[in-house]
Amino acid sequence: MTYFVLFLGLCFVLGGLAVASKPSPYYGVVGLVLASVAGCGWLLSLGVSFVSLVLFMVYLGGMLVVFVYSVSLAADPFPEAWGDLGVVGYGVGFVMVLMVGMVVGGFVGSLDFGVVTVDSVGMFSVRLDFSGVAMFYSCGVGMFLVAGWGLLLTLFVVLELVRGLSRGAIRAV
């Protein structure tokens, strides 16, 4: 199980690297999906199933919609793939900066791969992440509304930025 969790962590980092290496938006979407699936699978394997489900729905429901609209409205005649020299250069540069930062920060020798879960202890039947469901819906309502409004605003900003000189999503009535 520990190897599976480490594999999901590696997939999460590689997905983030695939988005950060600035390929064409077509390939950036694939990296975003890989990172979100691996990150939510990582949380799921650690026992945080509700938070994993909420984050997965936010990632794929919000951020992926913005990527899909930007890809459909800004088509590249010659998209950059992950094998192009510039994209590989960015990827190698990010990995080198990460490795130098770990060596300089002293994290290399102190990495501990112990994995713990958030399961309930003893005879308790309620897991720890399910006790936070009430907090999501009672105290977190305002934050959900702010996050939803931010995603909607981001969608309209991206649509306005990629529309060019033609009529876009927001028109004067």
Curated annotation (Swiss-Prot):
Entry keyword set: Electron transport, Membrane, Mitochondrion, NAD, Respiratory chain, Translocase, Transmembrane, Transmembrane helix, Transport, Ubiquinone
Annotated TM spans: 1-21, 27-47, 48-68, 87-107, 139-159
Family classification: Belongs to the complex I subunit 6 family.
Organism: Aethia pusilla (Least auklet)
Membrane topology: Multi-pass membrane protein
Protein name: NADH-ubiquinone oxidoreductase chain 6
Reported function: Core subunit of the mitochondrial membrane respiratory chain NADH dehydrogenase (Complex I) that is believed to belong to the minimal assembly required for catalysis. Complex I functions in the transfer of electrons from NADH to the respiratory chain. The immediate electron acceptor for the enzyme is believed to be ubiquinone.
Enzyme Commission code: 7.1.1.2
Reaction(s) the record says it catalyses: a ubiquinone + NADH + 5 H(+)(in) = a ubiquinol + NAD(+) + 4 H(+)(out)
Gene Ontology, cellular component aspect: mitochondrial membrane
InterPro entries xref list: ComplexI_Subunit6 (IPR050269), NADH_UbQ/plastoQ_OxRdtase_su6 (IPR001457), Nuo/plastoQ_OxRdtase_6_NuoJ (IPR042106)
